[in-house]
Amino acid sequence: MSRVSSIFIKMGILYFVKTMDTRYWGGSAWQLFHLIAFKSKHPDDVLNQMKDVLPCKFCRASTTEFVAKHPLHPSGSGSPRADPGRWLYEIHNMVNNKLRTQCKEDPAVIDPGPDPTFEDVKARYMSLKPTAVPGADFLASISANYPDDPEPNQMATQRTFLHALREVY
């Protein structure tokens, strides 16, 4: 049985959230972002905000570094990096490569296994019909990690992300 690291009540609902454990919210986040990348008509804003809202500060730092080295170009620009689905696939592989390195040094880090092909990932998400709210665990972790007394820039980041998410969700 895993340990719950946060318990909170919002709008009368009791939540138990393993807020920093990427095993809890990681898969949920990737599913949400891959669905948006492949199925949304305008995914760029959400994908560009992804690095700023991850619940784990180490994940935010790594993803910010990966995105700086491999930015998403605007859709329709003709650049190979203008394909949001392919771009996210490449960012996801960068994360997996980092995890593979870390798991050799730290047995607590889970090896993500081999990367699937882009074609397999695209086929999966293009055909996926979610039976639950995509990204629910990820979004709950964001909520649980939101500071009680946020700085104005933190509020602006969250608002920008949630507004962009509303446009594609």
Identify the meaning behind each predicted range.
Residues 2-169:
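Aromatic-rich, lipid-facing transmembrane alpha helices and their immediate juxtamembrane interface loops
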